[in-house]
């Protein structure tokens, strides 16, 4: 009973510290893709890995390609969660109690922080809102990372709509869902969610290129976001 209480308290502390760390440090901006902090961010690594291996899961037969799409998704998820699970298990198992809590907690805070995005997105939203208010459309389009829409032909009002739409979606993808995944499945769960969400962003499209290899990733993302989406809709 006492151990469960300690674990619950540790999880709460990790969540709070991860949020505070994000609010202080934020995330590396996509506007500077050559910086090493951007290149080594887990989401960026997941995206590049997915892009590089997807061609190996292509097949002329649609059914086979859908099956390979399952393998693609599982490959990415397992590749990024296995080292985390094994590493944290080793820390928890082989390092003496109390010391292992500190080490586990420190690493967990950093990893959970990397699955959420609050400061960077908030800064973007404020900057985009200011640019829209000033009718500075070129400046607004610098923040087109916000939306999956093609920003080239959007006017100020449409860009504003895109920002609001993306803020609502990212409330789920970069805040509520990763934190819920951590609360239920631990650090590995949060990393797994980030991998699933990244897969959806890379291949989860109904285009000729991705409709088969990405169907599993898209549906898996819908599944893991089912409850967070409903909770968010109640809040909004």
What are these regions (language model features)?
Residues 1-191, 204-236:
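Hydrophobic alpha-helical transmembrane segments
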Residues 197:
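Substrate/ligand-engaging "lid" and interaction regions
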Residues 201:
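Glycine-rich phosphate/dinucleotide-binding loop and adjoining beta-alpha-beta core of small-molecule
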């Amino acid at each position: 009973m006492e151990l469960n209480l300690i674990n619950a308290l540790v999880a709460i502390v990790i969540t709070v510290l991860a949020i505070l760390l994000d609010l202080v440090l934020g995330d590396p901006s996509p506007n500077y893709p050559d910086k090493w902090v951007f290149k080594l961010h887990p989401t960026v690594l997941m995206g590049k890995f997915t892009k590089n291996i997807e061609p190996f899961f292509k097949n002329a037969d649609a059914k086979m390609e859908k099956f390979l799409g399952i393998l693609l998704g599982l490959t990415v998820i397992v590749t990024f969660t296995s080292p985390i699970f094994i590493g944290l298990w080793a820390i928890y198992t082989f390092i003496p109690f109390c010391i292992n809590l500190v080490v586990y907690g420190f690493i967990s805070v950093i990893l959970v922080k990397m699955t959420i995005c609050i400061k960077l997105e908030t800064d973007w939203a404020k900057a985009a809102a200011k640019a829209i208010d000033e009718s500075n459309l070129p400046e607004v389009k610098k923040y087109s990372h916000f939306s999956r829409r093609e920003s080239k032909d959007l006017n100020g009002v449409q860009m504003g709509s895109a920002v609001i739409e993306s803020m609502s979606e990212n409330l789920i993808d970069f805040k509520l869902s990763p934190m819920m995944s951590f609360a239920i499945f631990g650090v590995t769960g949060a990393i797994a969610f980030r991998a699933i969400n990244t897969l959806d962003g890379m291949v989860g499209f109904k285009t000729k290129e991705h409709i088969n290899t990405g169907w599993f990733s898209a549906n898996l993302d819908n599944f893991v976001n089912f409850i967070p989406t409903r909770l968010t809709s109640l809040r909004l």
